[in-house]
């Protein structure tokens, strides 16, 4: 099986656009630095084409074995494609154990099928950064920050809850001093007038507008009775039994003689109905008054 079986044809449309964008991110200066580093560690020459020299995975496996001895147990020297893919897979497993993050590692086809050389370069740079943290002298990449663990007493941790972090912004030394709870009264006055602070609760600041001397004096709670009269007429206060003329007139009507709602009432007209008379106990009904209840004819 020849290696041409794994070579892809030219890309078109969106695939070509994505491939071009990835190729534009490839850094040739970083490639030269990685070449010098790998050749210096392994002692083997990669070749003119950097990615083609790493494609069989042999140099990559020897390289990780130099950084971490025993990482790859067997390196396949065969030119068959599946042996070369196995070398690349073993290299990926080895650098994962070495400490490179999974999201920084390329896939085997990115190198073997030439689909994403930029990701391969990013993986080698991440490997260089990890090698620096392990004490290797590397001039490529950026050294990862080392952990600086600290242990604090529980009392110190509780004190930290009272501090506002600068990452959350600053209150510019503002505080809640002088603030009252929501809904409580506030003393409002205009400090520009030079007056003292008011002692009563009826002062309204001029900054809030003016009430023109209005107050709530004489006002009653909602639903209570109000005495309504016209002060211009010079009359005294009306009592609660009279209805103001402004509200209309009841024409002398009252509730006299009215009973409680639901009680029985005797309804008759005295012009047409006689006063009912009932026979006494034991008296025959026919011997009673001719205009009694039973014999009114």
Swiss-Prot record:
One of its GO terms (biological process) is actin filament organization. GO terms for molecular function: actin filament binding; calmodulin binding. The modification Phosphoserine is found at residue 175. The modification Phosphothreonine is found at residues 170, 180, 184, 259. Calponin-like repeats lie at residues 164-189, 204-229, 243-268. It holds the Pfam family Calponin. Belongs to the calponin family. This is Calponin-1.
């Amino acid at each position: 099986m020849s290696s041409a079986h794994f070579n892809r044809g030219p890309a078109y449309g969106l695939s070509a656009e994505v491939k071009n964008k990835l190729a534009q991110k490839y850094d040739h200066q970083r490639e030269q630095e990685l070449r010098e580093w790998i050749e210096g560690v392994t002692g083997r020459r990669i070749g003119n084409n950097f990615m083609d020299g790493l494609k069989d995975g042999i140099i990559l496996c020897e390289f990780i074995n130099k950084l971490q001895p025993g990482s790859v147990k067997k390196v396949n020297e065969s030119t068959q494609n599946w042996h070369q893919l196995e070398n690349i897979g073993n290299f990926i497993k080895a650098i994962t154990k070495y400490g490179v993050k999974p999201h920084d590692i390329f896939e085997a086809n990115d190198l073997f099928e030439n689909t994403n050389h930029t990701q391969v370069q990013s993986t080698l740079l991440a490997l260089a950064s990890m090698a620096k943290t392990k004490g290797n002298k590397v001039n490529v990449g950026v050294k990862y920050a080392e952990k600086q663990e600290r242990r604090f007493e529980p009392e110190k941790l509780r004190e930290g809850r009272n501090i506002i972090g600068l990452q959350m912004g600053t209150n510019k030394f503002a505080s809640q001093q002088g603030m009252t709870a929501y809904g409580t009264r506030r003393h409002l006055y205009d400090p520009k007038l030079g007056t003292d602070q008011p002692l009563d609760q009826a002062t309204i600041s001029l900054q809030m507008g003016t009430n023109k001397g209005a107050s709530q004096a004489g006002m009653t709670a909602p639903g209570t009775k109000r005495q309504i009269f016209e002060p211009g007429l010079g009359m005294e206060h009306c009592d609660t039994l009279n209805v103001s003329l402004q509200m209309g007139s009841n024409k002398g009507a009252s509730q006299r003689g009215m009973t409680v709602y639901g009680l029985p009432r005797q309804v008759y007209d005295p012009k047409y109905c006689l006063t009912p008379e009932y026979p006494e106990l034991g008296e025959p009904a026919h011997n009673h008054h001719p205009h009694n209840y039973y014999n009114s004819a």
